[in-house]
Amino acid sequence: MNYTIIGTGAIGGFYGGRLMNAGRKVQFLLHSDYSFVRSHGLQIDSCDGSFHLDNVDCYDSTSKMPCADVILVGLKSTNNHLLKDLLSPIVGSNTTVVLIQNGIGLEEDLQQLFPGLAIIAGLAFICSSKIGPGHISHQCYGSINLGNYSCPDDRFQDILKDMQDAGITAAEVPYDEARWKKAVWNMPFNGMTVALNTSTDKLLGNPSTRRLIYEQMMEVINAAQALGVKGLDSSFADKMIEMTDAMVPYSPSMKLDFDNHRPMEIPYLYSRPISEARKVGFDMSKLAMLEAELQFIQDSYLKK
């Protein structure tokens, strides 16, 4: 199978780079880095072993790309309004799209745009950032959970195996469980680092915010349980706290968007899960308050 990477940044660049480094045929869509990567390749600095990729098959428009077997979407969900135009030229009858994005409801919305498309949710547990043109810094972790939304199982298993063969710690997790498990970490830490203008280690180093982070995690878990999602209980919140304690001090993607005055992923990270929970009578009150704070913060710099 050949792979196409849409969004060659901290996430797409890392996973696409690992696949290419393992010998898979991979093509990359680039924007501002196109000329640089075409001339100089991709550099992945990784805690698991750094590598450089020369002769990268890169494009500046999907209209110039051949149809893909598998498309990995690593764009921020704030750009999902572009997906119909981006994907239409490269989606064939047997194409699978893996949405490596944060939030709830992403696959449902993409399926409405492409009713027959095979879709997989990709939930990355990784600390990585783009630090320069064609230059990715992978600091720690790097696993990915795949949740099958609408993909034939044999194709799903082939993609899972390709990732594992490329040295990626990839696992199959039931779709709803995969999405909500990632939300347990994302909803507290992304928003709180913005609202308090801080980093993950400082949030957990203070007893008051450590307790609040845990309470927010349990709110996500309780919402998921109210929606019938299996595989989530308080032990998972404990695991996420323990994992974050062991991380290098980290600014999540939403904090970087805030720092650079870009739109934040509020709709899919907050508004959608809060709305879904309300439909079954569960009020995510602490996270709804955080959502309102984030909206105020974003409006203060986007509407100037």
Regions found by a protein language model. Give the residues of each.
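NAD(P)+-binding Rossmann beta1-loop-alpha1 motif at the extreme N-terminus of oxidoreductases
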Residues: M1-L53
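Hydrophobic anchor at the start of a short beta-strand
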Residues: Y3, K25-Q27, V97, I119, ...
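Short internal beta-strands
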Residues: F28-L30, L146, I274
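Short alpha-helical
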Residues: S32-F36, T78-N79, I104-G105, D154, ...
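Rossmann-like NAD(P)(H) cofactor-binding subdomain of soluble oxidoreductases
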Residues: S50-H135
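Internal alpha-helical scaffold of NAD(P)-dependent oxidoreductase catalytic cores
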Residues: P89-I90, Q112-A118, P133-P188, M192-L232
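NAD(P)-dependent Rossmann-like dehydrogenase/reductase catalytic/cofactor-binding core
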Residues: Q164, Y214-K304
